[in-house]
Amino acid sequence: MGLAKEHKTEIITKFGDSATDTGKAEVQVALFSRRIADLTGHLQQHPKDKHSRRGLLMLVGKRKRVLNYLKKVDIERYRKVLADLDLRK
């Protein structure tokens, strides 16, 4: 259950400098957030799917680590990502 290519390229061009800029922390956080939202919807329909729940928790942890890195490196970019994605922290 991955992201469609169109959604992925849309997120990359919105948060990255170019269409191939997938390594930027903002792009990674945005992609993780989209996958988390998709998995959350899946788990609301299938509450007993424990394997997907574990995947969701792993994605949340990855996003948290990238956000902590971004906060440590550049606080302004961190705040902008939180505002753009409506994440609370």
Curated annotation (Swiss-Prot):
Keywords: Ribonucleoprotein, Ribosomal protein, RNA-binding, rRNA-binding. Disulfide bonds: none annotated. GO terms for cellular component: cytosolic small ribosomal subunit. The lineage of its organism: Bacteria, Pseudomonadati, Chlorobiota, Chlorobiia, Chlorobiales. One of the primary rRNA binding proteins, it binds directly to 16S rRNA where it helps nucleate assembly of the platform of the 30S subunit by binding and bridging several RNA helices of the 16S rRNA. Forms an intersubunit bridge (bridge B4) with the 23S rRNA of the 50S subunit in the ribosome. Pfam families: Ribosomal_S15. Part of the 30S ribosomal subunit. Forms a bridge to the 50S subunit in the 70S ribosome, contacting the 23S rRNA. GO terms for biological process: translation. Belongs to the universal ribosomal protein uS15 family. Gene3D superfamilies: 6.10.250.3130, S15/NS1, RNA-binding. The gene is rpsO. This is Small ribosomal subunit protein uS15. It comes from the Bacteria. GO terms for molecular function: rRNA binding; structural constituent of ribosome.
